[in-house]
Curated annotation (Swiss-Prot):
Gene Ontology biological process terms, A to Z: tRNA methylation; tRNA wobble uridine modification
Subcellular location: Cytoplasm
UniProt KW keywords: Cytoplasm, FAD, Flavoprotein, NAD, tRNA processing
Protein name as catalogued: tRNA uridine 5-carboxymethylaminomethyl modification enzyme MnmG
Classification via NCBIfam families: mnmG_gidA
């Protein structure tokens, strides 16, 4: 049975990737359908109730800079905000919000239901319809067929998902939700390379059974950060603290004594788990020299009694989980509300994707989120946004768009996945980016909002606000450049009181601000440089641009060198077997990866500079040497 309407884009899945993937083409004007097995779990935070963190906060800001939802929802739901690495340089500072699960889900659903060009339908997708290697639509469990020109699959952990608690296991996409078994079988039939990964979650604890009085309290920042460039502190709900406890030798003994009942340590689980979010049993065994691990007790919401014990993800049996929880300070009488578990699921080799997240073998089919081997809400959202954009562009047969590594953390994420692939759940870190001084949270809008405007992703209100900010930055920099202070100035004594060393030669406001002891606030407290600008975002950009000017210019020079051939395109039909001078190993790797550019080829393990030179020579000989944008 065919559904009465035809869509431009269909998105399967209503998680963090799916919601961004559906909103993006709808904002661009494409008729979009979001297909989900349960409309009540749209935007569900399946694991930890938090958004952001090191590297992850950068992704949230980038999604927001292009009109995405995650930052807005985090502002509406954040019950504790912190800036991580606040004492370090601006490149690695990151925003993190503890979120109320219910408020977050409400914010997501409200945005989806009020988005023009977007329909939502509750039904499990069981098949992707393909004709002549081109996607044509989706069929559902009840036999309903939806026609579309492009499809974005964001299945999360649902593809052949299997939940493990102790040595017991059962099919499931997450606790309380069924797995997508039929869809998994269909995708395997398409010949895409598939493997298994696993992730886990800790037991949830009843807050009424925790003795908070004897635990260390962790408050959020006094000056509350805001995630969205369009947001304000007024968006935030009531702020509440988290608490800290620790595992101890008794905890570790409980774990060691029950490893024979662990699905991980008995070989029942075959999928590889996230390296940077290990289970508590993994931590105890891998770091056997440590007799304690810090555990954060994070509230799940303002109206919920559930507490998320961040740091004790486990798949051990329920009685062992009780032993672990009750062995810790403040949790001696704690009661578990929901058991922890591990989940195994299918993921597909991201090297089979273009950097647009379209599959190489099936035109119009895009993958985003955990199906590509990533872990984390933020990584999923960034991929969803990118896949949604390109699903829309594909419909109009327009040139695809994807960010470069020097342009965004999303670009780093996608390039890593599509070039190198992954054998374990991939998460973003600032250390993965070569040009992280340029890829800061604070300048995500400067990097990406003009592109978003060109693509039709943002409204005129956001565009006007962005342009006003850019104008404020330029005007203030020009003002500081034009005001000079000289050694005979009547304001010299006032200035010398705040300068580390007396002024001996004429200096502009920019020159003074470059001094390590000087800040914008101090500078604009001096009579010649009053008044301070009120636009705090613009102030931040002015101060960073001036103080880090030398470092920024150096990185930009490095980027220009790299870009010389970074975007030189390699045609899809380029035959490496006809290129003389390449070793069999290099030829095989290039055929396997099918890089789309010289830059991507150069990052494949084992591809030497000599091999890159040979390819460039052959591209030139064959008249194929074209520079990308």
């Amino acid at each position: 049975m065919f559904y009465t309407e035809t869509y431009d884009v269909i998105v399967i899945g209503g998680g963090h990737a799916g919601t961004e993937a559906a909103l993006a083409p709808a904002r661009m004007g494409f008729k979009t359908l979001l297909l989900t097995h349960n409309v009540d779990t749209l935007g569900q935070m399946s694991c930890n109730p938090a958004i952001g963190g090191i590297g992850k906060g950068h992704l949230v800001k980038e999604v927001d800079a292009m009109g995405g939802l995650m930052a807005h929802a985090a502002d509406k739901a954040g019950i504790q905000f912190r800036t991580l690495n606040s004492s370090k340089g601006p490149a690695v500072r990151a925003t993190r919000a503890q979120a109320d699960r219910v408020l977050y889900r409400q914010a997501v659903r409200t945005a989806l239901e009020n988005q023009p060009n977007l329909d939502i339908f509750q039904q499990e997708a069981t098949d992707i319809l393909i004709e002549q290697d081109r996607v044509t639509g989706v069929s559902t469990k009840m036999g309903l067929i939806f026609r579309a020109k492009s499809v974005v699959l964001t299945a999360g952990t649902f593809l052949a998902g299997k939940i493990h608690i102790g040595l017991e296991n059962y099919e499931g996409g997450r606790a309380g939700d069924p797995a997508s078994v039929n869809l998994s079988h269909r995708l395997r039939d398409l010949g895409l390379r598939v493997n298994r990964l696993k992730t886990g979650t800790p037991p949830r604890i009843d807050a009424r059974t925790i003795n908070f009085d004897i635990l260390a309290k962790q408050h959020g920042d006094e000056v509350l950060p805001v995630f969205s460039f369009m947001g304000s502190v007024d968006d935030h709900p009531q702020q509440i603290p988290c608490y800290i406890t620790h595992t101890n030798e008794q905890t570790h003994e409980v774990i060691r004594n029950n490893l024979d009942r662990s699905p991980m340590y008995t070989g029942v689980i075959e999928g590889i788990g996230p390296r940077y979010c290990p289970s508590i049993e993994d931590k105890v065994m891998r770091f056997s020299d440590r007799n304690s691990h810090q555990i954060y007790l994070e509230p799940e919401g303002l109206t919920s009694n559930e507490v998320y014990p961040n740091g004790i993800s486990t798949s051990l049996p329920f009685d062992v989980q009780m032993g672990i929880v009750n062995s810790m300070k403040g949790l001696e009488n704690a009661r578990i509300v929901k058991p922890g578990y591990a989940i195994e699921y299918d993921y597909f080799d991201p090297r089979d994707l273009k950097p647009t997240l379209e599959t190489k073998s099936i035109s119009g089919l895009f993958f985003a989120g955990q199906i590509n081997g990533t872990t984390g809400y933020e990584e999923a959202a960034a991929q969803g946004l990118l896949a949604g954009i390109n699903a829309g562009l594909y419909v109009q047969e327009k040139d695809a768009w994807y960010p470069r590594r020097d342009q965004s953390y999303t670009g780093v994420l996608v390039d890593d996945l599509c070039t190198l692939g992954t054998k374990e759940p991939y998460r973003v870190f600032t250390s993965r980016a070569e040009y992280r001084l340029l890829l800061r949270e604070d300048n995500a809008d400067i990097r990406l909002t003009p592109i978003a405007h060109e693509l039709g992703l943002i409204d005129e209100a956001r565009w006007a606000r962005f342009n006003q900010k850019m104008e404020n930055i330029e005007q203030e920099r020009q003002r500081l450049r034009s005001i000079w202070l000289h050694p005979r100035s009547e304001y010299l004594e006032e200035a010398n009181k705040v300068l580390g060393s007396p002024l001996v030669r004429e200096a502009s406001g920019e020159d003074l601000l470059r001094r390590p002891e000087m800040t914008y606030d101090i500078l604009t407290s001096l009579t010649p440089y009053k008044p301070a600008m009120e636009d705090k975002e613009a102030v931040e950009q002015v101060e960073i641009a001036i103080k880090y000017q030398g470092y920024i210019e150096h990185q930009q020079e490095e980027i220009e060198k790299q870009k010389r051939h970074e975007n030189t395109a390699i045609p899809a039909n380029f035959d490496y077997n006809k290129v003389s001078g390449l070793s069999n190993e290099v030829r095989a790797k290039l055929e396997q990866h099918r890089p789309v550019s010289i830059g991507q080829a150069s990052r494949i393990s084992g591809i030497t500079p000599a091999a890159i030179s040979i390819i460039l020579v052959n591209l030139k000989k064959q008249g194929m040497l074209k520079r990308g944008e």
